[in-house]
């Protein structure tokens, strides 16, 4: 499990979450937003 801390570019808030893998896909789970799992994509 990989933990991360991401600073939003347009706000002073820092988002903390967890990155996990399921069926060869990386997902992000945000601790402050429990229903907001997202697929991790490189932009």
Swiss-Prot record:
Gene Ontology MF: a single term: peptidase inhibitor activity
Top-level lineage group: Viruses
SUPFAM superfamilies linked: Nucleic acid-binding proteins
Family: Belongs to the orthopoxvirus OPG041 family.
Name of the protein described by the UniProt record: Truncated K3L homolog
Source lineage: Viruses, Varidnaviria, Bamfordvirae, Nucleocytoviricota, Pokkesviricetes
């Amino acid at each position: 499990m990989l933990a991360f801390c991401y600073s939003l570019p347009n706000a002073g808030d820092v988002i903390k979450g967890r990155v996990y893998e399921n069926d060869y896909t990386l997902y992000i789970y945000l601790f402050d937003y429990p229903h907001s799992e997202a697929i991790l994509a490189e932009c």
